């Protein structure tokens, strides 16, 4: 097993991203509460682990209960598709994305719930069971490409533009900002839930937060939202990546304040973390 590598990431932006303020995220939270399938997922205390580590408490947010999708991804996709339909009613309700994990299934599920269709592109090496899970959703198509994840993202974006469809991708880049930001705002519903649940357990605020990262939309959303809530009392936040696809780590390591990609065809045990390019709008 490789040793764990840790690097300190300085905040290089003078101002917090305004789209992640509690006020600007509130519409996403309210939308989720309006869904008939919505309920907060459990925040599970781990007292034995806390005793072993010598800390007051350890909590884990169990997203396996979210919308029956076994992942938090539905939070971002439902809100982004809802907003896309509301703001662009003239567009054909077909939603396109690239996925190497749960994101594509969540897009297909959300599109079907809202009366649309989904076209999902998957990188080479995608597990057949993941392809089948998407095909099982009404009005959803899944196609495996001979490309890595980052190449599949660009292919899906181009496909959506050529056909007049809507790309629902959490990877943001120049010229594609609004949808990824809606997705990131959707993820903050989980953070808001967790903070309220901690208080019910008698913990007023977290001292440390651990989040995983692929392109960094989820990690950036959690971090940005907490930064707005706590200001100078922001908890210590640790972002955990798979070593073959550690694009955030590499970006910090380069030290120039810019996002940097992992090239080639990285492979990770958890498919959803096999992402080589940071989301421009949640970096750093």
Where are these regions (language model features)?
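PLP-dependent amino-acid enzyme catalytic core
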Residues: 1-284
């Amino acid at each position: 097993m490789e040793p764990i590598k840790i690097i300190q990431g300085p905040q290089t932006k003078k101002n917090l991203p305004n789209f992640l303020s509690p006020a600007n995220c509130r519409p996403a939270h309210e939308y989720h509460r309006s869904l008939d399938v919505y309920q907060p997922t459990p925040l599970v205390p781990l007292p034995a682990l806390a005793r072993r580590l010598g800390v007051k408490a350890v909590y884990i947010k169990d997203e396996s209960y979210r919308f029956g999708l076994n992942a938090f991804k539905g939070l971002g996709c439902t809100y982004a598709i809802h907003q896309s339909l509301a703001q662009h009613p003239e567009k054909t309700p077909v939603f396109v994305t690239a996925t190497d994990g749960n994101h594509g299934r969540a897009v297909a599920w959300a599109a079907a719930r809202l009366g649309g269709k989904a076209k999902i592109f998957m990188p080479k090496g995608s597990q057949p069971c993941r392809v089948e899970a998407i095909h099982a959703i009404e009005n959803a198509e899944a196609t495996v490409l001979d490309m890595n994840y980052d190449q599949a993202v660009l292919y899906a974006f181009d496909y959506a533009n050529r056909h007049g469809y809507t790309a629902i991708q959490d990877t943001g880049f120049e010229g594609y900002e609004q949808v990824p930001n809606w997705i990131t705002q959707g993820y903050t519903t989980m953070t808001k839930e967790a903070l309220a649940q901690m208080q019910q357990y008698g913990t007023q605020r977290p001292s440390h937060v651990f989040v995983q990262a692929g392109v960094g939309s989820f990690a950036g959303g959690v971090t940005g939202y907490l930064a707005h809530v706590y200001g100078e009392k922001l908890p210590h936040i640790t972002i955990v990546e798979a070593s073959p696809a550690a694009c955030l780590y590499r970006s910090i390591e380069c030290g120039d304040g810019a996002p940097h990609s992992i090239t080639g065809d990285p492979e990770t045990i958890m498919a959803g973390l096999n992402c080589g390019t940071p989301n421009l709008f949640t970096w750093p």
